[in-house]
């Protein structure tokens, strides 16, 4: 199935669907070993205590594009009820097998709001969900998904502070 927004470097290819969910992660060969298998990796937003997964069915207005003359995504996600607009830029490093995401949040409310982002991974490492393992590394404050010789490290950085604050595996 064609995807709406692909980014990659020849060794790592990531495809997004029309609702800005990751659906395919090909590594180390483009077109072979899809570690997502078409299953969505969701992205969620909580404003104060009101939570929504990103997607048109959840009330999001979604505009997908690339930054001019680049393979850097520029997705604009607006939710009127939550009162926020997110500008999300994604890229795969040109030389390394690294996927990066930058999220800028604009609050449309008259008062300050607590905004939390949620990243949900649903790996099918080596094209099978059997034997996938996820573990939290407290020393580095990262989550690692692995099976066999394939490892995927998940990390975040907020205001120059690296590390995952909350996580769940299972």
Task: Please place each PLM-identified region on the residue numbering.
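Terminal accessory carbohydrate-recognition/targeting modules of carbohydrate-active enzymes
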Residues: 1-170
